[in-house]
A protein has these predicted regions:
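Mature catalytic core of soluble alpha/beta enzymes
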Residues: 1-207
Length: 207
């Protein structure tokens, strides 16, 4: 729905959003472990794995490199980075600058860095930004007070999923989830304030 309206530069009506929301339910994902199949219960439903695709690809690429005897590599899939071997400095994109201009950077070694934000894929109508990360409760782009969420941990796939959850739910609900998962984070708010979890306070450099 939103992809179609983005192409036209329009905003879907409330009725269209409510109709789309009526098709959203994780209970409609039917998995058969024996047959190794997945299907959706109702006509008109679709499953978008975009929020975890880069993370999965990065983890698989890293696994293949390790199996091939590679000890030093950097995988960069745009917002999803996996570092192997020597220490590296990874930049965190400034939400209001052109791609490649960092707001800050962190030093990483043998770990993954994943960022979810509203600044790469969006369109504007009457001065309002409509980005691609949707809130499944409202059907509209998430508005939880964050511009970007950067997470650091061993699995890019898991970080991809978790960063999206935190972005949609905001810092107040997201920080306890991060603490429970043992994941460090850099959060950038709507006001461009930067918050780092305790494990990154000495590591993060604001540019």
């Amino acid at each position: 729905l939103w992809r179609l309206h983005a192409r036209c530069g329009t905003v879907p009506s409330r009725a269209e959003v409510e109709q789309a929301l009526s098709l959203v339910s994780d209970e409609d994902i039917l998995l058969d472990e024996t047959a190794r199949t997945a299907e959706l219960a109702r006509f008109g439903q679709s499953l978008d794995l975009g929020s975890i695709a880069k993370g999965y690809a990065a983890d698989e690429a890293l696994r293949i490199l390790k199996e091939g005897g590679v000890h030093d590599a950097l995988i960069n899939l745009g917002g999803t980075v996996s570092a192997l071997g020597r220490p590296r400095r990874v930049g965190i994109q400034h939400p209001d600058r052109v791609t490649g201009i960092a707001m800050g950077r962190i030093s990483v070694e043998n770990t993954c860095v994943v960022t979810s934000g509203d600044y790469e894929r969006y369109y504007e109508v009457d001065g309002v930004r409509y980005h691609h990360i949707l809130d499944p409760k409202t059907g509209y782009p998430a508005r939880a007070g964050l511009r970007s969420v950067t997470l650091i941990g061993p699995s890019a796939l898991e970080l991809d999923a978790l960063s999206t959850v935190v972005f949609v739910n905001g810092a107040e609900e997201g920080l306890p989830l991060l603490k429970e998962a043992g994941v460090d984070a850099v959060l950038v708010t709507d006001q461009l304030d930067v918050f780092c979890t305790d494990g990154l306070r000495e590591n993060f450099e604001l540019l």
